[in-house]
Protein backbone atom coordinates (compact mmCIF):
# COMPACT_ATOMS: atom_id res chain seq x y z
CA UNK A 1 0.00 0.00 0.00
CA UNK A 2 1.43 3.36 -1.00
CA UNK A 3 1.81 6.12 1.62
CA UNK A 4 -0.66 8.28 -0.33
CA UNK A 5 -3.34 5.57 -0.18
CA UNK A 6 -2.71 5.10 3.54
CA UNK A 7 -3.32 8.80 4.12
CA UNK A 8 -6.69 8.76 2.32
CA UNK A 9 -8.15 5.51 3.56
CA UNK A 10 -6.40 4.22 6.63
CA UNK A 11 -4.86 6.94 8.75
CA UNK A 12 -7.23 7.97 11.55
CA UNK A 13 -9.77 5.23 10.78
CA UNK A 14 -10.76 3.00 13.68
CA UNK A 15 -13.24 0.23 12.94
CA UNK A 16 -16.07 -0.50 15.33
CA UNK A 17 -19.25 0.97 16.75
CA UNK A 18 -19.47 4.25 18.66
CA UNK A 19 -22.31 6.25 20.16
CA UNK A 20 -24.18 8.44 17.69
CA UNK A 21 -24.13 11.35 20.12
CA UNK A 22 -20.36 11.63 19.85
CA UNK A 23 -20.78 12.77 16.23
CA UNK A 24 -24.39 13.84 15.67
CA UNK A 25 -25.45 15.54 18.93
CA UNK A 26 -24.20 19.12 18.67
CA UNK A 27 -25.96 21.38 21.21
CA UNK A 28 -23.67 24.31 20.36
CA UNK A 29 -24.61 24.31 16.67
CA UNK A 30 -26.11 27.55 15.35
CA UNK A 31 -28.62 26.79 12.62
CA UNK A 32 -28.18 28.38 9.20
CA UNK A 33 -30.83 30.15 7.16
CA UNK A 34 -30.37 27.49 4.48
CA UNK A 35 -30.82 24.46 6.79
CA UNK A 36 -33.95 22.34 6.65
CA UNK A 37 -35.04 22.04 10.28
CA UNK A 38 -37.09 19.17 11.66
CA UNK A 39 -38.88 18.68 14.98
CA UNK A 40 -39.25 15.00 15.90
CA UNK A 41 -41.25 13.58 18.80
CA UNK A 42 -38.83 10.92 20.03
CA UNK A 43 -39.74 8.02 22.33
CA UNK A 44 -36.50 6.12 23.11
CA UNK A 45 -36.40 2.49 24.12
CA UNK A 46 -35.87 1.98 27.88
CA UNK A 47 -32.24 2.65 28.76
CA UNK A 48 -31.48 4.74 25.67
CA UNK A 49 -30.55 8.33 26.66
CA UNK A 50 -32.52 11.10 24.98
CA UNK A 51 -29.37 12.61 23.47
CA UNK A 52 -28.41 9.28 21.92
CA UNK A 53 -31.90 8.80 20.50
CA UNK A 54 -31.94 12.29 19.00
CA UNK A 55 -28.48 11.84 17.56
CA UNK A 56 -29.52 8.48 16.10
CA UNK A 57 -32.39 10.18 14.28
CA UNK A 58 -30.02 12.81 12.87
CA UNK A 59 -27.51 10.18 11.82
CA UNK A 60 -29.85 7.64 10.25
CA UNK A 61 -31.75 10.33 8.33
CA UNK A 62 -28.55 11.83 6.90
CA UNK A 63 -25.03 10.41 6.59
CA UNK A 64 -24.81 7.85 9.39
CA UNK A 65 -24.91 4.08 9.55
CA UNK A 66 -24.63 1.58 12.38
CA UNK A 67 -20.84 1.30 12.35
CA UNK A 68 -17.83 3.44 11.51
CA UNK A 69 -16.88 3.12 7.84
CA UNK A 70 -13.54 3.99 6.25
CA UNK A 71 -15.20 5.90 3.39
CA UNK A 72 -16.12 8.64 5.88
CA UNK A 73 -12.55 9.75 5.30
CA UNK A 74 -13.27 10.47 1.63
CA UNK A 75 -15.75 13.26 2.32
CA UNK A 76 -16.48 16.02 4.82
CA UNK A 77 -18.91 14.66 7.41
CA UNK A 78 -19.10 18.04 9.10
CA UNK A 79 -20.46 19.52 5.89
CA UNK A 80 -23.08 16.88 5.13
CA UNK A 81 -24.23 15.35 8.42
CA UNK A 82 -27.54 16.07 10.10
CA UNK A 83 -27.20 17.52 13.58
CA UNK A 84 -29.44 17.09 16.60
CA UNK A 85 -28.95 20.56 18.06
CA UNK A 86 -31.58 20.63 20.82
CA UNK A 87 -33.68 18.21 22.87
CA UNK A 88 -36.51 19.06 25.24
CA UNK A 89 -38.84 16.87 27.29
CA UNK A 90 -42.52 16.82 26.31
CA UNK A 91 -44.52 18.22 29.22
CA UNK A 92 -46.99 15.71 30.62
CA UNK A 93 -45.60 12.74 28.70
CA UNK A 94 -43.28 10.13 30.15
CA UNK A 95 -40.11 9.39 28.17
CA UNK A 96 -41.05 11.59 25.21
CA UNK A 97 -38.83 14.31 23.82
CA UNK A 98 -38.82 16.83 21.00
CA UNK A 99 -35.55 16.45 19.12
CA UNK A 100 -34.58 19.26 16.76
CA UNK A 101 -32.47 18.26 13.77
CA UNK A 102 -30.78 20.51 11.21
CA UNK A 103 -30.03 19.17 7.73
CA UNK A 104 -27.62 20.88 5.31
CA UNK A 105 -29.33 21.92 2.09
CA UNK A 106 -26.84 19.96 -0.03
CA UNK A 107 -28.43 16.69 1.14
CA UNK A 108 -31.55 17.29 -0.96
CA UNK A 109 -32.36 17.29 -4.66
CA UNK A 110 -33.89 20.52 -5.86
CA UNK A 111 -37.64 20.46 -6.52
CA UNK A 112 -38.17 16.92 -5.19
CA UNK A 113 -40.51 16.27 -2.27
CA UNK A 114 -39.88 12.59 -2.95
CA UNK A 115 -36.17 12.94 -2.22
CA UNK A 116 -36.77 15.16 0.82
CA UNK A 117 -39.03 12.59 2.47
CA UNK A 118 -36.86 9.66 1.44
CA UNK A 119 -34.01 11.28 3.35
CA UNK A 120 -35.80 12.62 6.42
CA UNK A 121 -38.38 9.88 7.08
CA UNK A 122 -37.41 7.11 4.70
CA UNK A 123 -35.53 4.72 6.98
CA UNK A 124 -35.20 6.00 10.52
CA UNK A 125 -38.74 5.16 11.68
CA UNK A 126 -37.92 1.47 12.00
CA UNK A 127 -34.79 2.09 14.08
CA UNK A 128 -34.54 -0.30 17.05
CA UNK A 129 -33.25 2.31 19.50
CA UNK A 130 -36.60 4.10 19.20
CA UNK A 131 -39.90 2.87 20.60
CA UNK A 132 -41.74 5.47 18.49
CA UNK A 133 -40.96 8.49 16.33
CA UNK A 134 -43.14 11.25 14.90
CA UNK A 135 -42.16 14.09 12.60
CA UNK A 136 -44.06 17.08 14.03
CA UNK A 137 -42.89 19.90 11.77
CA UNK A 138 -40.38 21.01 9.14
CA UNK A 139 -38.88 24.43 8.43
CA UNK A 140 -38.40 24.73 4.67
CA UNK A 141 -35.88 27.50 3.92
CA UNK A 142 -36.53 29.87 1.01
CA UNK A 143 -33.37 28.58 -0.64
CA UNK A 144 -35.12 25.21 -1.00
CA UNK A 145 -38.77 26.23 -1.43
CA UNK A 146 -37.82 28.44 -4.39
CA UNK A 147 -36.74 25.32 -6.29
CA UNK A 148 -40.42 24.23 -6.38
CA UNK A 149 -43.20 25.50 -8.64
CA UNK A 150 -45.75 25.05 -5.87
CA UNK A 151 -49.52 25.21 -6.51
CA UNK A 152 -50.46 25.40 -10.20
CA UNK A 153 -52.36 28.68 -9.71
CA UNK A 154 -53.10 29.64 -6.11
CA UNK A 155 -55.99 31.33 -4.34
CA UNK A 156 -56.14 34.70 -6.10
CA UNK A 157 -55.80 33.26 -9.61
CA UNK A 158 -58.55 30.72 -8.85
CA UNK A 159 -60.92 33.44 -7.67
CA UNK A 160 -60.19 35.43 -10.83
CA UNK A 161 -60.83 32.37 -13.00
CA UNK A 162 -64.14 31.69 -11.26
CA UNK A 163 -65.10 35.37 -10.78
CA UNK A 164 -66.16 34.58 -7.20
CA UNK A 165 -65.12 36.77 -4.28
CA UNK A 166 -65.99 37.56 -0.69
CA UNK A 167 -67.19 34.14 0.47
CA UNK A 168 -66.09 30.54 0.84
CA UNK A 169 -66.65 28.31 -2.18
CA UNK A 170 -69.24 25.53 -1.93
CA UNK A 171 -68.72 21.94 -3.01
CA UNK A 172 -70.31 18.51 -2.83
CA UNK A 173 -69.00 14.97 -3.13
CA UNK A 174 -71.31 12.87 -5.30
CA UNK A 175 -72.87 9.97 -3.39
CA UNK A 176 -73.04 7.03 -3.46
CA UNK A 177 -69.35 7.26 -4.15
CA UNK A 178 -69.32 3.96 -6.06
CA UNK A 179 -71.89 2.15 -8.18
CA UNK A 180 -73.58 4.86 -10.26
CA UNK A 181 -73.50 4.71 -14.06
CA UNK A 182 -71.77 7.60 -15.81
CA UNK A 183 -75.05 9.13 -17.01
CA UNK A 184 -76.71 9.00 -13.59
CA UNK A 185 -73.53 10.36 -12.06
CA UNK A 186 -73.60 13.30 -14.48
CA UNK A 187 -77.25 13.92 -13.64
CA UNK A 188 -76.39 14.16 -9.93
CA UNK A 189 -73.59 16.62 -10.77
CA UNK A 190 -75.95 18.81 -12.82
CA UNK A 191 -78.61 18.97 -10.10
CA UNK A 192 -76.08 20.01 -7.44
CA UNK A 193 -74.50 22.69 -9.63
CA UNK A 194 -77.77 24.23 -10.82
CA UNK A 195 -78.92 24.40 -7.20
CA UNK A 196 -76.13 26.84 -6.35
CA UNK A 197 -72.91 24.95 -5.63
CA UNK A 198 -69.63 26.05 -7.18
CA UNK A 199 -68.13 22.57 -7.44
CA UNK A 200 -69.00 18.92 -7.31
CA UNK A 201 -66.44 16.21 -6.73
CA UNK A 202 -65.42 12.67 -7.56
CA UNK A 203 -64.76 10.76 -4.37
CA UNK A 204 -61.20 9.63 -3.79
CA UNK A 205 -61.74 6.04 -4.93
CA UNK A 206 -63.64 6.95 -8.11
CA UNK A 207 -61.06 6.21 -10.79
CA UNK A 208 -62.07 3.96 -13.70
CA UNK A 209 -64.05 0.94 -12.50
CA UNK A 210 -66.18 -1.49 -14.53
CA UNK A 211 -69.46 0.24 -13.59
CA UNK A 212 -68.17 3.68 -14.70
CA UNK A 213 -65.11 4.16 -16.90
CA UNK A 214 -63.28 7.45 -16.54
CA UNK A 215 -63.84 8.71 -20.08
CA UNK A 216 -67.63 8.23 -19.86
CA UNK A 217 -67.71 9.99 -16.50
CA UNK A 218 -65.67 12.93 -17.78
CA UNK A 219 -68.00 13.42 -20.78
CA UNK A 220 -71.24 13.34 -18.77
CA UNK A 221 -69.79 15.60 -16.07
CA UNK A 222 -68.66 18.12 -18.70
CA UNK A 223 -72.18 18.14 -20.13
CA UNK A 224 -73.56 18.75 -16.64
CA UNK A 225 -71.15 21.65 -16.06
CA UNK A 226 -72.06 23.42 -19.31
CA UNK A 227 -75.79 22.97 -18.76
CA UNK A 228 -75.62 24.29 -15.17
CA UNK A 229 -73.49 27.25 -16.26
CA UNK A 230 -75.98 28.17 -18.97
CA UNK A 231 -78.87 28.09 -16.50
CA UNK A 232 -77.23 29.91 -13.59
CA UNK A 233 -74.84 32.34 -15.27
CA UNK A 234 -72.10 31.22 -12.85
CA UNK A 235 -68.85 29.40 -13.58
CA UNK A 236 -69.07 25.81 -12.34
CA UNK A 237 -66.65 22.91 -12.00
CA UNK A 238 -66.40 19.23 -11.15
CA UNK A 239 -63.25 17.69 -9.67
CA UNK A 240 -62.47 15.05 -12.30
CA UNK A 241 -60.27 12.50 -10.55
CA UNK A 242 -57.29 11.86 -12.81
CA UNK A 243 -55.59 9.48 -10.35
CA UNK A 244 -54.49 6.34 -12.19
CA UNK A 245 -52.20 3.34 -12.00
CA UNK A 246 -49.41 5.02 -13.99
CA UNK A 247 -48.25 8.61 -14.43
CA UNK A 248 -48.78 8.29 -18.18
CA UNK A 249 -52.42 7.29 -17.72
CA UNK A 250 -52.93 10.08 -15.18
CA UNK A 251 -51.66 12.72 -17.61
CA UNK A 252 -53.80 11.22 -20.41
CA UNK A 253 -56.88 11.75 -18.25
CA UNK A 254 -55.85 15.33 -17.45
CA UNK A 255 -55.33 16.02 -21.16
CA UNK A 256 -58.85 14.76 -21.93
CA UNK A 257 -60.30 16.94 -19.15
CA UNK A 258 -58.58 19.97 -20.67
CA UNK A 259 -59.90 19.08 -24.13
CA UNK A 260 -63.44 18.97 -22.70
CA UNK A 261 -62.93 22.47 -21.30
CA UNK A 262 -63.12 21.34 -17.67
CA UNK A 263 -61.71 23.93 -15.23
CA UNK A 264 -60.33 21.53 -12.62
CA UNK A 265 -58.97 18.01 -12.11
CA UNK A 266 -58.25 16.04 -8.97
CA UNK A 267 -55.51 13.81 -7.58
CA UNK A 268 -55.11 11.52 -4.55
CA UNK A 269 -51.64 12.77 -3.70
CA UNK A 270 -50.58 10.29 -1.02
CA UNK A 271 -51.76 7.10 -2.71
CA UNK A 272 -50.67 8.48 -6.10
CA UNK A 273 -47.29 9.60 -4.79
CA UNK A 274 -45.40 12.89 -4.74
CA UNK A 275 -43.61 12.34 -8.04
CA UNK A 276 -46.93 11.81 -9.82
CA UNK A 277 -48.48 14.76 -8.01
CA UNK A 278 -45.69 17.16 -8.95
CA UNK A 279 -45.87 16.01 -12.57
CA UNK A 280 -49.62 16.66 -12.64
CA UNK A 281 -49.21 20.06 -10.96
CA UNK A 282 -46.74 21.12 -13.64
CA UNK A 283 -49.15 19.99 -16.36
CA UNK A 284 -52.01 21.89 -14.71
CA UNK A 285 -50.10 25.16 -14.57
CA UNK A 286 -48.96 24.83 -18.17
CA UNK A 287 -52.52 24.13 -19.35
CA UNK A 288 -54.70 26.33 -17.16
CA UNK A 289 -56.27 23.58 -15.04
CA UNK A 290 -56.93 23.98 -11.33
CA UNK A 291 -55.84 21.01 -9.19
CA UNK A 292 -57.90 19.65 -6.29
CA UNK A 293 -56.02 17.37 -3.89
CA UNK A 294 -57.54 14.62 -1.78
CA UNK A 295 -55.52 13.32 1.18
CA UNK A 296 -56.73 9.70 1.11
CA UNK A 297 -54.48 7.54 3.34
CA UNK A 298 -53.33 10.47 5.49
CA UNK A 299 -54.66 9.00 8.76
CA UNK A 300 -52.47 5.92 8.26
CA UNK A 301 -49.54 8.32 8.57
CA UNK A 302 -50.72 11.09 10.89
CA UNK A 303 -53.35 9.79 13.34
CA UNK A 304 -51.08 8.27 16.00
CA UNK A 305 -49.91 10.94 18.44
CA UNK A 306 -46.47 9.46 19.04
CA UNK A 307 -45.55 7.82 15.73
CA UNK A 308 -45.73 8.79 12.08
CA UNK A 309 -45.98 12.31 10.76
CA UNK A 310 -48.26 15.23 11.61
CA UNK A 311 -50.53 16.43 8.82
CA UNK A 312 -48.95 19.90 8.94
CA UNK A 313 -45.84 18.31 7.41
CA UNK A 314 -47.91 16.65 4.68
CA UNK A 315 -49.64 19.99 4.09
CA UNK A 316 -46.32 21.80 3.65
CA UNK A 317 -45.15 19.07 1.31
CA UNK A 318 -48.31 19.42 -0.76
CA UNK A 319 -47.85 23.17 -1.09
CA UNK A 320 -44.38 22.50 -2.45
CA UNK A 321 -45.42 19.62 -4.70
CA UNK A 322 -48.44 21.48 -6.02
CA UNK A 323 -52.20 21.68 -5.46
CA UNK A 324 -54.81 24.43 -5.43
CA UNK A 325 -57.15 22.75 -2.89
CA UNK A 326 -56.49 20.17 -0.19
CA UNK A 327 -58.77 18.50 2.33
CA UNK A 328 -57.94 19.80 5.79
CA UNK A 329 -60.55 18.42 8.20
CA UNK A 330 -63.58 20.27 9.55
CA UNK A 331 -63.16 20.65 13.34
CA UNK A 332 -66.96 20.18 13.57
CA UNK A 333 -67.83 17.15 11.39
CA UNK A 334 -67.32 13.39 11.43
CA UNK A 335 -63.53 13.39 10.91
CA UNK A 336 -60.95 14.10 13.57
CA UNK A 337 -59.52 17.62 13.81
CA UNK A 338 -58.58 19.83 16.78
CA UNK A 339 -59.41 23.48 16.20
CA UNK A 340 -56.13 25.26 17.01
CA UNK A 341 -53.96 22.59 15.40
CA UNK A 342 -56.17 22.59 12.31
CA UNK A 343 -56.01 26.37 11.99
CA UNK A 344 -52.24 26.14 12.37
CA UNK A 345 -51.78 24.06 9.24
CA UNK A 346 -54.57 25.94 7.44
CA UNK A 347 -52.45 29.08 7.86
CA UNK A 348 -49.41 27.16 6.62
CA UNK A 349 -51.39 26.35 3.47
CA UNK A 350 -52.77 29.83 2.79
CA UNK A 351 -50.46 32.47 4.23
CA UNK A 352 -47.14 33.77 2.97
CA UNK A 353 -45.41 34.13 6.35
CA UNK A 354 -46.33 32.15 9.47
CA UNK A 355 -44.79 32.85 12.87
CA UNK A 356 -43.72 30.09 15.24
CA UNK A 357 -46.61 29.30 17.61
CA UNK A 358 -46.33 26.16 19.71
CA UNK A 359 -49.93 26.53 20.95
CA UNK A 360 -51.01 25.77 17.36
CA UNK A 361 -48.33 23.16 16.77
CA UNK A 362 -46.13 25.41 14.64
CA UNK A 363 -42.56 24.68 15.71
CA UNK A 364 -40.79 26.97 13.24
CA UNK A 365 -41.40 30.30 11.55
CA UNK A 366 -42.13 29.54 7.88
CA UNK A 367 -41.51 32.02 5.06
CA UNK A 368 -42.99 30.86 1.74
CA UNK A 369 -41.52 33.86 -0.14
CA UNK A 370 -44.62 34.44 -2.28
CA UNK A 371 -45.31 30.81 -3.20
CA UNK A 372 -49.04 30.64 -4.15
CA UNK A 373 -51.40 29.53 -1.40
CA UNK A 374 -53.69 26.49 -1.20
CA UNK A 375 -57.41 26.60 -0.38
CA UNK A 376 -58.24 24.32 2.58
CA UNK A 377 -61.27 22.11 2.00
CA UNK A 378 -63.59 21.36 4.93
CA UNK A 379 -65.31 18.06 4.21
CA UNK A 380 -66.73 15.16 6.17
CA UNK A 381 -70.04 14.91 8.02
CA UNK A 382 -71.03 18.57 7.75
CA UNK A 383 -74.50 20.04 7.15
CA UNK A 384 -76.35 23.37 7.23
CA UNK A 385 -76.27 23.72 11.02
CA UNK A 386 -72.46 23.69 10.81
CA UNK A 387 -72.37 26.57 8.32
CA UNK A 388 -71.90 29.42 10.85
CA UNK A 389 -69.04 27.63 12.61
CA UNK A 390 -67.35 26.69 9.32
CA UNK A 391 -67.64 30.24 8.00
CA UNK A 392 -66.18 31.61 11.22
CA UNK A 393 -63.39 29.04 11.53
CA UNK A 394 -62.17 28.86 7.93
CA UNK A 395 -63.01 32.34 6.62
CA UNK A 396 -63.51 33.26 2.98
CA UNK A 397 -60.48 31.50 1.49
CA UNK A 398 -61.78 27.96 1.83
CA UNK A 399 -64.00 25.37 0.19
CA UNK A 400 -66.89 24.02 2.28
CA UNK A 401 -67.83 20.63 0.91
CA UNK A 402 -71.12 18.94 1.79
CA UNK A 403 -71.62 15.43 0.39
CA UNK A 404 -74.38 13.77 2.38
CA UNK A 405 -75.26 17.27 3.58
CA UNK A 406 -76.38 18.08 0.02
CA UNK A 407 -77.47 14.80 -1.53
CA UNK A 408 -79.17 13.64 1.67
CA UNK A 409 -81.73 16.45 1.44
CA UNK A 410 -85.26 14.97 1.53
CA UNK A 411 -86.27 16.82 -1.65
CA UNK A 412 -83.23 15.89 -3.73
CA UNK A 413 -79.87 17.22 -4.86
CA UNK A 414 -80.87 20.63 -6.21
CA UNK A 415 -82.88 21.63 -3.11
CA UNK A 416 -79.96 20.35 -1.00
CA UNK A 417 -77.63 22.66 -2.90
CA UNK A 418 -80.08 25.56 -2.52
CA UNK A 419 -80.19 24.98 1.24
CA UNK A 420 -76.41 25.12 1.53
CA UNK A 421 -76.10 28.20 -0.67
CA UNK A 422 -78.80 30.07 1.27
CA UNK A 423 -77.19 29.11 4.59
CA UNK A 424 -73.77 30.29 3.38
CA UNK A 425 -75.05 33.59 1.98
CA UNK A 426 -76.94 34.22 5.24
CA UNK A 427 -73.82 33.58 7.33
CA UNK A 428 -71.61 35.78 5.14
CA UNK A 429 -74.15 38.62 5.23
CA UNK A 430 -74.54 38.32 9.01
CA UNK A 431 -70.78 38.35 9.49
CA UNK A 432 -70.41 41.40 7.25
CA UNK A 433 -73.08 43.16 9.32
CA UNK A 434 -71.01 42.54 12.44
CA UNK A 435 -72.98 39.68 13.97
CA UNK A 436 -71.20 37.01 16.02
CA UNK A 437 -71.40 33.72 14.09
CA UNK A 438 -70.14 31.66 17.02
CA UNK A 439 -72.85 32.97 19.37
CA UNK A 440 -75.73 33.72 16.99
CA UNK A 441 -75.15 31.00 14.37
CA UNK A 442 -78.27 28.92 15.04
CA UNK A 443 -80.45 32.03 15.10
CA UNK A 444 -79.00 33.18 11.76
CA UNK A 445 -79.82 29.82 10.16
CA UNK A 446 -83.36 29.84 11.60
CA UNK A 447 -83.98 33.35 10.26
CA UNK A 448 -82.87 32.29 6.77
CA UNK A 449 -84.96 29.12 6.91
CA UNK A 450 -88.09 31.21 7.49
CA UNK A 451 -88.02 32.34 3.85
CA UNK A 452 -86.22 29.33 2.30
CA UNK A 453 -88.29 26.13 2.40
CA UNK A 454 -85.27 24.15 1.11
CA UNK A 455 -83.18 25.30 4.08
CA UNK A 456 -86.07 24.71 6.49
CA UNK A 457 -86.35 21.09 5.32
CA UNK A 458 -82.58 20.58 5.69
CA UNK A 459 -82.63 22.07 9.19
CA UNK A 460 -85.37 19.67 10.22
CA UNK A 461 -83.58 16.59 8.86
CA UNK A 462 -80.23 17.30 10.53
CA UNK A 463 -81.28 19.13 13.67
CA UNK A 464 -80.16 16.32 15.99
CA UNK A 465 -77.13 14.96 14.09
CA UNK A 466 -73.89 14.90 16.10
CA UNK A 467 -70.69 12.88 15.77
CA UNK A 468 -69.61 12.20 19.35
CA UNK A 469 -67.34 9.21 19.83
Curated annotation (Swiss-Prot):
The keyword Disulfide bond applies. Binds 1 Mg(2+) ion per subunit. Its main location: plastid. It catalyses: 2 (2R)-3-phosphoglycerate + 2 H(+) = D-ribulose 1,5-bisphosphate + CO2 + H2O; D-ribulose 1,5-bisphosphate + O2 = 2-phosphoglycolate + (2R)-3-phosphoglycerate + 2 H(+). CDD domains: RuBisCO_large_I (cd08212). GO terms for molecular function: magnesium ion binding; monooxygenase activity; ribulose-bisphosphate carboxylase activity. Its cofactor is Mg(2+). It is found in: Plastid, Chloroplast. The disulfide bond which can form in the large chain dimeric partners within the hexadecamer appears to be associated with oxidative stress and protein turnover. GO terms for cellular component: chloroplast. Signal peptide: none annotated. The keyword Plastid applies. It holds the Pfam family RuBisCO_large_N. Mg(2+) binds at residues 201, 203-204. The modification N6,N6,N6-trimethyllysine is found at residue 14. The modification N6-carboxylysine is found at residue 201. The active site is at residues 175, 294. HAMAP family: RuBisCO_L_type1 (MF_01338). Heterohexadecamer of 8 large chains and 8 small chains; disulfide-linked. The disulfide link is formed within the large subunit homodimers. Belongs to the RuBisCO large chain family. Type I subfamily. NCBIfam families: PRK04208.1 (NF003252). The basic functional RuBisCO is composed of a large chain homodimer in a 'head-to-tail' conformation. In form I RuBisCO this homodimer is arranged in a barrel-like tetramer with the small subunits forming a tetrameric 'cap' on each end of the 'barrel'. RuBisCO catalyzes two reactions: the carboxylation of D-ribulose 1,5-bisphosphate, the primary event in carbon dioxide fixation, as well as the oxidative fragmentation of the pentose substrate in the photorespiration process. Both reactions occur simultaneously and in competition at the same active site. This is Ribulose bisphosphate carboxylase large chain. It comes from Iris ensata (Japanese iris). The gene is rbcL.
Amino acid sequence: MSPQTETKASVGFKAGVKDYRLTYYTPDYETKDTDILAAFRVTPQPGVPAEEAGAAVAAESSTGTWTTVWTDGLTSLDRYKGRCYHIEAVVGEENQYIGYVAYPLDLFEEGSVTNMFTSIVGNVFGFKALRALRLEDLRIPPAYSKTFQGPPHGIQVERDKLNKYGRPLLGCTIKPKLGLSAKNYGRAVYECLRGGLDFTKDDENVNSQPFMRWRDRFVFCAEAIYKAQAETGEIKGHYLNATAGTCEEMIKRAVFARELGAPIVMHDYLTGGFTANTSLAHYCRDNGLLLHIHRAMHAVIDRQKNHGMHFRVLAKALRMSGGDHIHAGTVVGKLEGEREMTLGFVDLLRDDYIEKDRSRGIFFTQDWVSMPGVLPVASGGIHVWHMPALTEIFGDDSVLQFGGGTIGHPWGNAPGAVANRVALEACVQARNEGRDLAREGNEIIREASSWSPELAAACEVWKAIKFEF
